[in-house]
């Protein structure tokens, strides 16, 4: 099931979706091809799982950003809508959504956020034919267990 805010902020859509069986997080999150993340509801499905498992989502603060690769702005928009639908009170995003993993970890701790979502596939090449990743850090600024 995925919850996301619609164009009308008072309306929330709930979709029952079959799980994506290849969404098994690795060391720091989910890393797949950009094309996989472009499948309908693929990103939303993983982010839904994140919001259902991170403690303190309702009323909490989330840090969000990434390395600026292909797909980052779309992902940021999706995650922002879902964050609103899940009742987060604040999402901290830098200009253009550009945020390194160490900077995200620091912001999470300094702003006492519930965690952060970092959009990066690290050293893997980006682009439409490259890779995309969603890392999840907890309130301590470090990776959440997979």
Where are these regions (language model features)?
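An N-terminal, well-structured beta->alpha segment
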Residues: 1-86
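Short, intrinsically disordered, charge-balanced linker/junction segments flanking boundaries
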Residues: 143-146
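Ferredoxin-reductase
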Residues: 58-141
């Amino acid at each position: 099931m995925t919850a996301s805010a619609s164009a009308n902020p008072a309306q929330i859509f709930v979709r029952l979706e079959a799980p994506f069986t290849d969404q098994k997080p690795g060391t720091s999150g989910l890393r797949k091809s950009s094309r996989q993340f472009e499948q309908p509801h693929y990103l939303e499905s993983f982010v839904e799982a994140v919001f259902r498992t991170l403690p303190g989502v309702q009323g909490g603060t989330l840090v969000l950003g990434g390395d600026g690769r292909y797909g980052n702005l779309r992902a940021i928009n999706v995650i922002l809508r879902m964050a609103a639908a899940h009742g987060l009170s604040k999402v901290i995003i830098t200009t253009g959504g550009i945020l390194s993993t160490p900077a995200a970890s620091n912001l999470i701790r300094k702003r006492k956020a519930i965690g952060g979502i970092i959009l990066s596939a690290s050293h893997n090449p980006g682009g439409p034919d490259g890779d995309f990743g969603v890392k999840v850090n907890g309130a301590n600024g470090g990776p959440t267990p997979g």
